[in-house]
């Protein structure tokens, strides 16, 4: 009959689509598993503790996705030292591009790290983030204008999104005082390393 719908064929097509969809989804799952495994292997290689584990790629909350301020600082330091392109991206204030599929559509991004807008020009990326359990978080690279001080400051579970940016200058001042104190006292190298490690845990 002209115009009649062949439901058996329609169901077969739907079945094929479902099979293809499941195959694609399974490959995606396997790819993500491999990616998580690689992330955790890399974190261990960089010297992160067992208190760090990655279980998602998007950065949102997951019960098996956790870390510490020291480990985040370790990862941040490696990123800016060994990946120049990433260092350039995280310090970009604005970026825009046009879609290949929609040439007239322009995408615009603004860096959410308020510290890179600071007039002192001593702050650089690294990462902002907020989840329900971790709260407002921030990893920042501080480098003094004279080049004397160069370190990473990490804030986790700040009271508000705005508060994390206000806490950074205070932590920088505190860290500089601690570092200067360490330099003035003639500690044994092992004790000095331990004091600096405690500083990173603050």
Cite the ranges covered by each PLM segment.
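Penicillin-recognizing serine hydrolase domain
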Residues: 3-201
């Amino acid at each position: 009959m002209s115009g009649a719908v062949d439901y058996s064929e329609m169901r077969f097509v739907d079945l094929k689509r479902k099979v293809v969809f499941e195959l694609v989804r399974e490959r995606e799952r396997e790819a993500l598993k491999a990616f998580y495994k690689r992330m955790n292997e890399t974190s261990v290689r960089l010297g992160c503790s067992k208190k760090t584990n990655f279980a998602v790629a998007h950065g949102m909350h997951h019960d098996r996705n956790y870390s510490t301020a020291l480990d985040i600082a370790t990862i941040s330091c490696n990123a800016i030292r060994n990946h120049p392109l990433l260092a350039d991206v995280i310090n970009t204030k604005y970026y825009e591009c046009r879609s290949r599929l929609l040439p007239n559509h322009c995408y615009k991004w603004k860096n959410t790290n308020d510290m890179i807008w600071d007039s002192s020009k001593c702050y650089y990326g690294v990462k902002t983030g907020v989840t329900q359990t971790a709260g407002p978080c921030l990893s920042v690279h501080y480098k003094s204008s004279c080049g004397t001080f160069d370190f990473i400051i990490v804030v986790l579970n700040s009271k508000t999104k705005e508060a994390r940016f206000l806490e950074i200058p205070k932590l920088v001042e505190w860290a500089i005082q601690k570092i200067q104190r360490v330099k003035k006292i003639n500690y044994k190298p092992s004790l000095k390393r331990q004091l600096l490690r405690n500083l990173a845990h603050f």
